[in-house]
């Protein structure tokens, strides 16, 4: 009987945060994800022995975890969390406050009452330049919770110390702090053995990525970016295929030393591939590689149906040969970006329903289907309820009980289906089948130019030999990593962008220092330009726009509040930003809302649904509108008003119209909102029962409605 074979590949990666000269870890995220994800993601599979999966381990991440496990890692963030609260200097207090709330508020801060209480107190006391008045006990509790919130569900439920800290919640002691530091080292020490255990049993396969996570096609030849994006502005040519080979060879050696055998498989950093990369990988002994369905589409020159996607391929050129699978971009991104907003069971049901539907025709024809699900194995879970563990248990349990569905490793899957031949692979990544995230923008190109200068300096500094030369070359390999240019350019944002910029320039400066040369002055200046975050402008007066879906006149929305979303993603990429701008305001009797959409998505709106929730800011029930979009406009599909409004004269409590923009009117009395009262609201866009965008991404937008009496004053 034909089967559906699911190939899950979880990519585990963090940038190389260690400065090789100072020995310090400049950011704590490898340690934090070791607590929250690296162990728990593989440990959960022991509950589901039928589920076989592939884990893609980046050696530079594993090396950092090993340093934390040995106690050799020097981490100022951990040191600050362990310092006695009574002894904190003013500088350390500011450091603790700045870095203790880098967590998702909904799922990682407010989940724990004391952490949420401290977060609210920090926000309330944080006017520009103001000093936050926390007691020593407040600081100690914050030091503990900034770490505890990152402990995996496994430890929160089964480890006696961690479970007791979570239960107690407050009034932690210095002994608790010290034990918490020891516990982190213990957990880091459990990561590698857990992978070794399940790899030895055959339940998981270990694949890898080039050692410091470079975009291999660009390291081989940066000019190849012009193939996938003609006319993209490019920096001076960087062409060092020998570095690409070295990064891959180091990875194979590292994995072989840890797991007793070299890896068969390769997830090139960010799914970035080219014929030259495949040739090098094949020559080094890799037998398979994975990339994205977008790359397959551009390779064959057209959109590939699921019959073509759900099968393996065999790439051959000259003496080179590699098995290749292409990730289902849509299904993988559902886990990465959409299901976090849904009930765990409903999300698992939706996922498997889509797979059954996609595979029905393939199975009916008598063929097996191989479905590659490939995504980040760490960053998505902080946006899920309880770190995504309820969702994974629902999903794995259902797959285990499906008679025509089997979860396999990639190598297992490649043995089960005959491959389709490929004589060429289009150069691209999993993001839009090009390399635009890492090259082409002004910041990116400046980073590549500085990398090239350092690389050329290394080649010419032949007088330096031995350990210093080796360390200089290692710094070059680190600087070739993809993570630095991930944060340059317009695509992504993080509060840590300045630290990433500083760390990249430090790695390049260290190249010169190890070569006994003074770093060029340009490395002392930030590459980053000024960021443009989300902006919010309060309403300045009453408005009464015509609800026609058109910008009838500049003046009809004059006085409205404006919210412009920050359109950069964080550490995850794949979020669609459909809404460009929100305008809002009121008159004596109505609340008005206008959504302006990005032109690139205007044609995709038909079939979507806008959901608007609004109500009094202080207390009271919220009202809800569901608005369906069609090619001809928009209609209200559902309206739940806080106050009964059946007897309101036409056009009733609410109306809407979609053309160039979406315009919405909602009666203030029907919402239970008095004139002059504060109102809060949020909007989301849905398609096929899945959330696609939300404004704002967290929390509510707020405004005060028009008060005629106040205006007369």
Regions flagged by a language model, labelled:
Residues 2-164, 301-541:
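Active-site and substrate-binding clefts of carbohydrate-active enzymes
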Residues 56-61, 210-213, 265-274, 410-414:
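Short, solvent-exposed turn/loop segments enriched in Gly/Ser/Thr/Pro and often Arg
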Residues 230-268, 356-374:
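CE4/NodB-like, metal-dependent polysaccharide N-deacetylase domain
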Residues 166, 171-172, 177-189, 194, ...:
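Long amphipathic alpha-helical scaffold segments
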Residues 530-542, 611-637, 659, 669-713:
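Acidic/polar low-complexity flexible segments
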Residues 209, 549, 590-598, 662-667:
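Short, well-ordered beta-strand segments enriched in hydrophobic/aromatic residues
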Residues 580-583, 649-655:
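Beta-strand-rich interaction surfaces with strong enrichment in secreted/lumenal proteins
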Residues 125-197, 218-219, 232, 268-312:
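Extended, H/D-rich, highly charged conserved domains that either
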């Amino acid at each position: 009987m034909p089967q559906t074979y699911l190939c899950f590949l979880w990519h585990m990666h963090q940038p190389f945060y260690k400065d090789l000269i100072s020995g310090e870890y400049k950011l704590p995220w490898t340690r934090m994800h070791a607590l929250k994800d690296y162990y728990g993601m593989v440990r959960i599979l022991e509950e589901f022995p039928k589920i076989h999966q592939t884990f893609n381990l980046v050696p530079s991440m594993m090396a950092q975890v090993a340093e934390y496990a040995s106690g050799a890692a020097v981490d100022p963030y951990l040191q600050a969390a362990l310092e006695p609260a009574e002894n904190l200097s003013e500088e350390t207090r500011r450091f603790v406050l700045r870095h203790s709330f880098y967590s998702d508020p909904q799922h990682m801060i407010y989940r724990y009452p004391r952490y949420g209480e401290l977060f609210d107190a920090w926000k309330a006391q944080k006017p520009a330049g103001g000093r936050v008045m926390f007691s020593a006990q407040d600081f100690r509790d914050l030091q503990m919770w900034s770490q505890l919130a990152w402990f995996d569900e496994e430890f929160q439920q089964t480890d006696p110390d961690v479970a007791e800290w979570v239960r107690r919640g407050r009034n932690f002691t210095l002994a608790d702090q010290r034990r918490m530091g020891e516990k982190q080292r213990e957990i880091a020490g459990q990561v590698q053995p857990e992978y070794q255990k399940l790899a030895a049993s055959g339940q998981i396969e270990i694949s890898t990525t080039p050692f410091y996570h470079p975009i291999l096609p660009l390291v081989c030849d940066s000019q190849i970016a012009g193939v996938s994006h003609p006319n993209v502005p490019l920096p001076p040519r960087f062409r060092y295929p020998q570095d690409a080979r070295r990064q891959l060879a180091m990875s194979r050696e590292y994995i072989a030393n840890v797991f007793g055998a070299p890896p068969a498989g390769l997830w090139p950093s960010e799914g970035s591939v080219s014929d030259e990369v495949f040739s090098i990988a094949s020559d080094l002994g890799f037998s398979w590689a994975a990339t994205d369905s977008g790359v397959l589409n551009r390779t064959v020159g057209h959109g590939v149906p699921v019959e073509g996607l759900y099968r393996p391929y065999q790439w051959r050129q000259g003496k080179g040969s590699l098995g290749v699978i292409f990730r289902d971009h849509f299904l993988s991104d559902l886990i990465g970006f959409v299901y976090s907003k849904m009930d765990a069971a409903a999300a698992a049901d939706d996922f498997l329903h889509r797979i059954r539907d996609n595979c029905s025709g393939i199975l009916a024809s008598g063929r097996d289907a191989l479905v590659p699900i490939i995504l980040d194995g760490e960053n998505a879970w902080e946006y899920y309820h309880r770190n995504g563990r309820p969702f994974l248990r629902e999903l794995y349990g259902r797959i285990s009980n499906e008679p025509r569905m089997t979860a396999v490793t990639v190598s297992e899957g490649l043995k089960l289906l005959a491959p389709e031949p490929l004589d060429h692979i289009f150069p691209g990544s999993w993001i839009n089948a090009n390399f635009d995230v890492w090259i082409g923008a002004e910041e990116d190109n400046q980073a590549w130019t500085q990398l090239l200068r350092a690389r050329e300096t290394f080649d010419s500094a032949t007088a330096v030999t031995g350990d210093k030369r080796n360390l200089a070359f290692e710094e070059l390999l680190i600087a070739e990593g993809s993570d630095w240019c991930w944060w340059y350019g317009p695509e992504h944002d993080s509060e840590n962008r300045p630290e990433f910029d500083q760390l990249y320039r430090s790695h390049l400066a260290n190249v010169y220092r190890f070569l006994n040369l003074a770093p060029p002055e340009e490395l002392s200046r930030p590459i980053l330009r000024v960021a443009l975050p989300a902006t919010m402008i309060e309403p300045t007066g009453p408005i009464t726009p015509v609800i026609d879906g058109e910008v009838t006149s500049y003046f009809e929305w004059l006085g409205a509040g404006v919210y412009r979303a920050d359109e950069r993603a964080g550490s995850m990429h794949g979020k669609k930003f459909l809404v460009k701008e929100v305008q809002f305001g009121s008159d004596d009797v109505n609340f008005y809302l206008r959504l302006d959409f990005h032109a690139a998505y205007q044609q995709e709106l038909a079939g979507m649904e806008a959901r608007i929730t609004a109500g009094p800011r202080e207390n009271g029930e919220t009202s809800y509108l569901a608005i369906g979009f069609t090619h001809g406009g928009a209609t209200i599909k559902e309206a739940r008003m806080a106050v009964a409004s059946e007897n309101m004269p036409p056009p009733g409590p609410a109306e809407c119209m979609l053309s160039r923009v979406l315009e919405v009117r909602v009666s203030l009395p029907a919402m239970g909102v008095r004139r002059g009262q504060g109102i809060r609201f949020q909007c989301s866009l849905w398609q096929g029962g899945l959330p696609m965008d939300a404004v704002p991404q967290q929390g509510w937008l707020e405004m005060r409605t028009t008060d005629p009496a106040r205006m007369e004053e």
